[in-house]
């Protein structure tokens, strides 16, 4: 029995050490790059819908599309594009099984940010009337059929996204503590860059409050719950190696983050 206890402690220490061995800068870079990609896809897609339908001009920024000519379909397109993007990234993740695990982690984080933000729009907007669905719900009494449908439908999609993401992370990692650390670092790094870009938005506090920023920040917090749904495994034999420092990821992410904050954060005027 003493031998069993003695071997249990080193094994626990080994798991903790492994959970902390991934390079912090590289992991943050992958998360930031994934977040920027999904945000640009959603917001630029929304801008494209607006310009192709009703808006002759508007401002595209990191926290949303702003125009005096938008309608409910333009306001709704952000969430829809996010969910479509999540599905595409999920397919890519499942297809690139032989790629390096840092690449697969990038695709999985892209899927996570897009899915949680997209589904979160429905849930939060059904309760609060702000974000992309703010215009659609303006003037309606609380708990109409539309708002109830948004909350219920969004919650179902959100739960499905958490379940699917847990299966994805379960294919890469077997250590729960390692997954928690990866998700914590990813959320902090992504939201920090997002907030930095929002500070430079020329629309001021009012536009920021009604932008996608509050919903995205709250929705992506769901990353912390992914580890709760990880499949239980008896052995960690399939655990991937630690993430070493990659200046390719760090450099690419740094350039994109600077452009995201100082260019897209200030907004770009677009017209037909």
Positions of predicted regions on the chain:
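Membrane-interfacial, low-structure loops and terminal tails that flank and connect transmembrane helices
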Residues: 5-18, 168-185, 235-246
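Alpha-helical transmembrane segments and their helix-start/interface "positive-inside/aromatic belt" motifs
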Residues: 18-33, 99-111, 245-251
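Small-residue-rich helix-interface/hinge motifs
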Residues: 22, 30-86
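Final/C-terminal transmembrane alpha-helix of multipass membrane proteins
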Residues: 32-33, 244-270
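Membrane-helix interface motif
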Residues: 47-57, 115-132, 266-271
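Cytosolic, membrane-interface loops and tails of multi-pass inner-membrane proteins
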Residues: 55-63, 130-139, 168-178, 236-239
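Metalloprotease/metallohydrolase-associated module, dominated by Zn2+-dependent proteases
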Residues: 66-168, 186-201, 223-231, 256
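Short alpha-helical packing/oligomerization segments
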Residues: 201-225
